């Protein structure tokens, strides 16, 4: 096979590198090194990345934990489907179940308090997206995803399912209330 435009010199790799090429190679290398070290540095220093833990579980065991959590801390029911609104104690654990077309239950948190979230799926892979904070986690069956969250603004927030889970995917929405 031959090139359409063969090089003028057949042995081009023995030619000295031009200064402008050397400058660009150096800039690219230095920038690559800066970015390589900035990623772990910013993970530690920046506040936008979640440091989460993941544990093996079963859907049955996680559902039992979540239902016990809901039974203990439910304060009211909302919506046409009577979803429980759960207000855990400050510093407590929060359990959320992802399942076909549903994030369960609705959570009510206190502003400025830290909570430990436990997420798991009972059926398929789901995406947990807390908006507008833009926190995203892939939630898988047989795994319990745990992270800490401290709400800093009061209001109503949406939990969006951002992983396609079937024909009712557009219904995979949950709520989060943050109160003073």
Where in the sequence are the language-model features?
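Residue-level signature for short turns and capping positions that connect secondary-structure elements
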Residues: 101, 133-135, 164
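Histidine (H) residue identity feature
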Residues: 18, 43, 49, 55, ...
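Residues that flank catalytic or metal-binding motifs in active/ligand-binding sites
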Residues: 92, 113, 124, 172-173
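Generic preference for hydrophobic/aromatic residues in regular secondary structure cores
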Residues: 102-105, 176
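Membrane-embedded segments
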Residues: 106-110, 114-158
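Divalent metal-coordination and catalytic microenvironments
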Residues: 96, 117, 161
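Extracytoplasmic entry segments of secretory-pathway proteins
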Residues: 1-101
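Extracellular/periplasmic metallocenter environments
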Residues: 28-48, 64-65, 137-180
């Amino acid at each position: 096979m031959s090139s359409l435009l063969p090089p003028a010199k057949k042995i081009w790799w023995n030619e000295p590198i031009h200064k402008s090429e050397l400058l660009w190679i150096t800039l690219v290398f230095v920038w690559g090194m800066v970015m390589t070290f900035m990623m772990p540095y910013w993970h530690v220093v920046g506040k936008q990345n979640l440091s989460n833990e993941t544990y093996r579980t079963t859907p049955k065991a996680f559902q039992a934990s979540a239902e016990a959590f809901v039974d203990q801390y439910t304060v009211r029911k909302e919506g046409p489907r009577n979803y429980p609104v759960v207000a855990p104690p400050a510093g407590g654990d929060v359990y959320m179940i992802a399942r076909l077309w549903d994030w369960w239950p609705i959570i009510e948190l206190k502003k400025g308090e830290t909570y430990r979230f436990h997420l798991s799926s009972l059926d398929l892979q789901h995406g947990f997206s807390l908006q507008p904070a833009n926190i995203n986690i892939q939630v898988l069956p047989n795994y319990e995803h745990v992270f800490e969250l401290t709400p800093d603004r009061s209001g109503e927030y949406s939990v969006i399912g951002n992983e396609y889970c079937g024909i009712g995917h557009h219904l995979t929405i949950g709520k989060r209330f943050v109160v003073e």
